[in-house]
Amino acid sequence: ACLPNSCVSKGCCCGBSGYWCRQCGIKYTC
């Protein structure tokens, strides 16, 4: 599932991990 838009970094849709943006390869914290 994707995280809410408020948790998304640089407009990327994130995968299962809440700390990893799979599409862009950017780590971030909500």
From Swiss-Prot:
Report the principal subcellular site: secreted
Q: Which domain of life is it from?
A: Eukaryota
Q: A single GO CC term, please?
A: extracellular region
Q: What stretches pass through the bilayer? A: none
What UniProt keywords are attached to this protein's entry? Answer: Antibiotic, Antimicrobial, Disulfide bond, Secreted
Give the intrachain disulfide bonds.
Answer: 2-7, 12-24, 13-30, 14-21
Which compartments is it annotated to reside in? Secreted
GO BP terms, alphabetized: defense response to bacterium
This molecule's function is given as: Sillucin is an antimicrobial agent produced by the thermophilic fungus Rhizomucor pusillus in liquid culture; it is effective against Gram-positive bacteria at the level of RNA metabolism.
**Identification of the protein by name:** Sillucin
Query: What is the native source organism of this protein?
Result: Rhizomucor pusillus
